[in-house]
Every structure is written in C-alpha cells, then in structure tokens.
C-alpha cells in the first residue's frame, strides 16, 4: 500500500515536471502535429458550417491535447460564444490571450461577449486593448474597423444613458 502511494506521488511529480517543462498531453500520447492539424481543420470546418456543438467537442479535446496552441482556445471560445455561453467563451479567450499576448482577436471577441452581457465598461476596455494590439497591422484592417465601430457605439450608448439620467 505504501509503495503504491509512493509510486503515485512520483508519477504525479514526473507528470507535473513534464508539463511545466513544456510537455503536452499530445506528446505523452505520441499524437503528431499533423494529426492535431487535421483535428483543427475538422473543428474549424464544423464551426464554419454552424455545427458549433460538434466543433466545440473537438476544440475542447485539442485544448487538452496541446494547451500551448492559442488557436485552439480561439476556436473553443468562438464555439462557446456562438452557443451563447459568454462566460465560458470569455474564459477561453482569456487563456488564449495569456498564450499569445499580441493577438488582438482575444480581447476583441471577449469584448463582444461582454457586450452581450451588458458590461459596457469591461467591453470598452477589451476593445481598447484590441485596438492597441492591432496598431497599424494591415492583416487586421477589417478587425480594426469593427473595433472602431464598436467603440463608437459604446460611446453613443453611454451618452444616451447619461442623457436619460440627467433628463428623466
């Protein structure tokens, strides 16, 4: 019994060390990067086809298999957002943002979720961050336009709310 406990503890320590050292569950199970890419393509295509629950399952598995690939968390967040699971989507986007701090889509999509929840100040903060991350990157020109439009809409909504309070 004592030996079993010691073996389990040693295994847990070895696993923790492996994961902290950059290892993934995919590596442990010898799942190739090609296989992960095929799964990603499957999930992406399911998402694009509106099969959010199916895509969600695959993205969730991908996040477990390789918790370092931020694309998987972007996909997971997008599925959750499409299914109206805004809090869970925000969690996915937040984790992805930690993995890729220069990716403006994470704060942008989190802001969309926050807007759906009616949390204007928090959404505005996310949009400002997205705007800052976009800077003058040409590949995010369309996203930049959307961010600007959403910030303007929030500004107008705040002004309307102020007018309603000032002029009841």
Swiss-Prot record:
PROSITE patterns: TPR_REGION
InterPro entries: T3SS_Ca_resp_chp_LcrH/SycD, T3SS_Ca_resp_chp_LcrH/SycD_sub, TPR-3, TPR-like_helical_dom_sf
One family name in Pfam for this protein: TPR_3
Disulfide bridges in this chain: none
Superkingdom in the source lineage: Bacteria
Record keywords: Chaperone, Plasmid
Function recorded in the entry: Mediates the negative regulation of the lcrGVH operon by ATP or calcium. Acts as a modulator of the yop operon expression.
NCBIfam families assigned to the protein according to its UniProt record, in alphabetical order: LcrH_SycD
Family: Belongs to the LcrH/SycD chaperone family.
Descriptive protein name: Low calcium response locus protein H
Source species: Yersinia pestis
